[in-house]
Amino acid sequence: MDGYLHYAINIQKRNNKNKMLKIKTYLEKSKLIPEAGIGLFADEDIKEGQIIWSKDEELDITFTEENFQLLDESQKEFFKKYCYKENGEYIFCIDNGRFLNHSEEINNTLEIYQKSIAKRNIPKGEEIICNYKEMGTTKEDEECNISF
């Protein structure tokens, strides 16, 4: 597991032009959802309709249910905190997109499970919030994502 994660991080470093987050961001304690811990914040003004994030198969780590069950409990807890489910598989974003927190009141929306679009202008310094129910392709995925 550690070797695979190290490999994925090295791919991200080599492929910065293909990074999933398409905007400048920084991490800070969540102001909107303090119990969530760390949140993802805009480090630039974002215009309505601007792409915030796009999926990159090379930079995401995908676990089948069978592979996920092979992890020890501490690994499962880590990945449950930072993964989302799509088509019954666990997807782990290796960039800071994994720090997007959940709320019903969001400032961006997921489009066809491939990219996230700003729903409105987002000023620099605002926390970027998404609805975990939009992540996934099935009702089971949605329920799992919301329970994480």
Per-region residue spans from a language model:
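Conserved catalytic SET/PR domain of SAM-dependent protein methyltransferases, capturing the structural core
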Residues: 2-148
